[in-house]
Regions:
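Terminal catalytic/cofactor-binding subdomain
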Residues: 1-132, 139-143, 165, 179
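Sequence termini and other peripheral, non-core segments
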Residues: 1-38, 42-55, 337-457
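Loop-rich catalytic cores of soluble enzymes, especially ATP-dependent carboxylate-amine ligases
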Residues: 9-11, 106, 117-137, 141, ...
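A short glycine-rich, hydrophobically flanked beta-strand micro-motif that places a catalytic Asp/Glu
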Residues: 97-102, 329-331, 580-584, 591, ...
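A long amphipathic alpha-helix within ATP-dependent nucleotide-binding catalytic cores
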Residues: 255-268, 313, 572, 576, ...
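ATP-binding N-terminal substructure of ATP-dependent carboxylate-amine bond-forming enzymes
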Residues: 432-501, 505-508
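Active-site nucleotide/adenylate-binding loops and adjacent lid/helix of ATP-dependent enzymes
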Residues: 473, 482-644, 693
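C-terminal active-site "lid" helix and adjoining low-complexity regulatory extension at the edge
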Residues: 653, 678-690, 704-708, 717-764
Length: 764
């Protein structure tokens, strides 16, 4: 390979060096509330562990493994993993996810259940039984993170077309990935020295010595990462793998298999692996970095800085000049340096096995070279990567600030089990209180985020087709469904959606079906509406666009004595449509009834946007304070919406003789709107189990009348306990795109899990 030309092509396409596919795999041991190993089976809610693409088991039945799909950025991979962590946490009852790579409390003669498999996957269980006999169950219980990375396909295509490193895609992949691995193996000690996070084990933990076969305490030197030390996840013997070429690599592994020293490539516990996929014709597909410890300071267990640095080190390994091979002596030296970083990483004055230089001095030299080369190729033009590079330079100059050092001090101060147990409890609480998010996709509507979380639980794949429009594809190998904004699906016909969108048509169809709706008239201009003002003066009315959703453009005038307010309400409605309805206001409380496939699956009473006075702050200030609640946001990305301070709110306050500067009395509740949509700042209260069944039956009949399978139906009810009559209720609206998140995370009441019910309705 012509190195000069190779580097020239990379520099010409440096913007592609940061791109690629990124994936994470993570294991956590399930523990009881006291920190002991949970002996319950892998939760059945996750389905078949042999087939689930995201959630399975590792060595032990008590050890959950979480796997992200390949994603286009480190940030999205981190977000997906945190979401997986939340999904698992939400479905293991009172159990906790142990946040440390090293095992929790293991009693004397502790039972450590091997992961159970059946049917076509039974061989996985047999393989684990063999590992238990060879390495001991305690060692196999050590958990960690694998970071998977492949370079951009665009970059690979450009390298192929340039001819600088091969005449076929297979040759290009071989050249690129083997070059990266050779360099990464030499520098891996630096990653461990910066980001090792398993400095101490529980005092009673003993593991089988790989040399003598006898049990020994899990301790070595002034350790920083016992997981990556000789006491951690290693093979019985140190193998020499030839990384000079794909052919040499395969030959060295085949030799180990023939000599019965390993069962197959999967038993090579290497710090970094080259992975192969059939789609790439047996050539390297991606690199798996296996030396990342769990981070007890992060809920997901994945330190973002560690992953970003790993990516930078991989890119640096591509750009850094090297001779094209590693001798056995060089590989041994690299392993000794890994052992030094693992076992003596807390001593920054320790010398490396290459030269008479301290680890801190060598780390500084490498990081400065990384900064120079990565800057030269434009990799650090990205703000995130530039900050991460600066962070690592700071750590090498302030080694006591390394995360493993901080962890060591905390364990020494609090104790191994108490420290990690408290973290596990904190993270469980954080998930339970804020688990509505799909991390990394927070810019999408919350209903879509929740639907995707339900898909993860079921092991359903998904593709985001249009992020801004919340348009996704769901698939599982048997079928696929296209969904927009969580509830626009193939279950409903286009004409049914149009009927719901058009409030005039909705009313006419429901009237023909014998269902009560408000009386009123439609107008095609503000002037026509104003001409009939005397018809409505002094009577409570609702003025709304003919086609509306989410309560947009709706004004309720309960008293309607002010012609100016009537005119303003008409103007607001006409801003949203060219036809407006003026209807009789129906007394009672408004309820949102959600229907899926002719079944009522959730009912909410929505309290209009409101504030409660304290005798000091004015209404505007009280709104600002209430909007600080983290559950409130904008654009349907949180369970509740922020309260607005717009014309509609101003008009409603005026009708009450108030404005935004009015100071309410202490405990006085002031309403900002008459309509109770969550989308305009209202509060949601679950009433699914409280309303008389007659109203539910009417709601289902209404859905059938419009031939719709998914709808959010708004019904006014005077007395929820009295059976329905033609005069004590009315359906005021049927929505074709109802939000599901308000039923999943109501202000008060049960989570009705509409995201999971939507997944079932779609046939998954």
């Amino acid at each position: 390979m012509n190195t000069q030309n190779f580097c020239f092509v990379l520099k010409q396409n440096s913007h592609l060096l940061r791109e690629g596919c990124f994936g994470l795999e993570k294991e956590n041991v399930r523990v009881n509330q006291d920190g002991t190993l949970a002996l319950t089976p892998h939760p059945a809610v996750f389905g078949d562990k042999g087939k689930h693409p995201y959630i399975t088991t590792d060595f032990s039945e008590s050890q959950v493994e979480m796997i992200t799909p390949p994603l286009p950025s480190v940030g999205e991979a981190l977000g997906f993993m945190e979401t997986l962590h939340d999904v698992v946490t939400e479905n293991i009852g009172d159990e906790l996810l142990w946040p440390q790579s090293l095992p929790p409390v293991l009693k004397e003669n502790q039972e450590i259940p091997i992961a159970h498999y059946s049917g076509e996957f039974k061989d996985k269980e047999y393989y684990r039984q063999k590992l238990a006999g060879t390495y001991g169950k305690e060692r196999q219980l050590i958990s960690g993170i694998h970071f998977n990375f492949s370079f951009s396909e665009k970059l690979m295509d450009i390298l192929l077309k340039s001819g600088v490193c091969g005449n076929s895609m297979e040759e290009v992949r071989e050249t690129v990935y083997f070059r990266v691995v050779r360099n990464f193996l030499k520098y891996r000690w630096l990653f461990i020295w910066l980001y090792g996070e398993s400095p101490l084990a529980e005092e009673t933990l003993n593991v089988i010595s790989l040399k003598t076969g006898e049990k020994q305490p899990m301790k070595c030197g002034v350790s920083l990462s016992l997981r990556t030390s000789p006491l951690g996840y290693r093979n019985r013997e140190e193998f020499f793998i030839d990384y000079s070429s794909l052919e040499a690599y395969n030959m060295s592994i085949d030799k180990l298999i023939r000599e019965n020293r390993i069962d197959g490539p999967h038993e090579l516990y290497l710090p970094v692996r080259i992975k192969f996929l059939e789609k790439d014709n047996g050539s390297p597909s991606y690199i798996e970095v296996r030396i990342v410890d769990l981070d007890p300071f992060t809920k997901s267990g994945v330190c973002a800085s560690a992953i970003y640095f790993s990516h930078l080190l991989l890119v640096y390994s591509l750009l850094k000049e090297e001779k094209g091979s590693l001798t056995e002596e060089e590989l041994q030296r690299a392993t000794r340096n890994q052992d030094m970083a693992s076992c003596y990483g807390r001593d920054e004055k320790k010398e490396l096995k290459c030269c008479s230089i301290t680890v801190q001095q060598k780390a500084t030299s490498i990081l400065e070279d990384m900064e120079r080369i990565l800057s030269e190729y434009g990799v650090l033009d990205d703000e995130i990567y530039r900050q991460e590079m600066q962070h690592n330079l700071y750590l090498v100059q302030n080694p006591e600030k390394r995360i493993g050092m901080v962890l060591y001090e905390n364990i020494n101060r609090v104790g191994f089990v108490p420290f990690h147990l408290e973290k596990a409890r904190q993270y469980r609480e954080a998930t339970i209180s804020g688990g509505y998010r799909f991390h990394g996709l927070e810019d999408m509507e919350m209903s879509t985020q929740l639907l995707l979380k339900a898909a993860i639980l079921k092991g359903i794949g998904f593709e985001i087709l249009d992020r801004k429009e919340n348009f996704i594809r769901l698939f599982d190998g048997k079928k696929e469904e296209y969904v927009m904004q969580a509830t626009k699906t193939s279950l409903d016909s286009y004409v049914s959606v149009l009927m719901m969108e058009n409030k005039v048509v909705t009313k006419k169809v429901l009237e023909r079906a014998g269902i009560s709706v408000p009386g009123g008239y439609e107008y095609t201009s503000p002037e026509a509406g104003m001409a009939d003002y005397r018809l409505y003066a002094g009577k409570p009315v609702v003025i709304k666009p003919k086609s509306t959703n989410f309560g947009l453009g709706i004004t309720i005038l309960k008293h309607n004595y002010d012609e100016t307010d009537f005119k303003a309400a008409l103007q607001i409605a006409f801003e949203h449509d060219n036809t407006v309805l003026i209807e009789k206001f129906i007394p009672g409380r408004e309820f949102r009834i959600f229907i899926i496939n002719d079944e009522v699956v959730g009912i909410l009473h929505r309290v209009p946007a409101n504030v409660t006075g304290d005798g000091v702050l004015n209404i505007g200030q009280l709104i600002d304070m209430k909007n600080e609640d983290p559950l409130r946001g904008k654009g349907y990305r949180t369970p509740l919406e922020k309260i607005r301070k717009g014309r509609e709110e101003e008009m409603f306050l005026k009708q009450q003789g108030m404005d935004f500067n009015t100071v309410p009395k202490e405990r006085e509740v002031v309403y900002l709107r008459e309509n109770s949509n969550i989308s305009t700042g209202g509060d949601s209260i679950d009433f699914t189990d409280d309303i008389d069944d007659s109203y539910k039956a009417i709601a289902v009949e209404a859905a059938k009348a419009l031939n719709v399978k998914i709808t959010g139906l708004d019904m006014m009810i005077q007395d929820i306990h009295a059976p329905a009559t033609p005069d004590n209720y009315a359906i005021i609206e049927m929505n074709f795109n109802p939000a599901i998140h308000i039923h999943c995370y109501p202000f008060k009441g049960k989570n009705r899990h509409l995201n999971h019910k939507m997944i079932r309705a779609l046939g998954f």
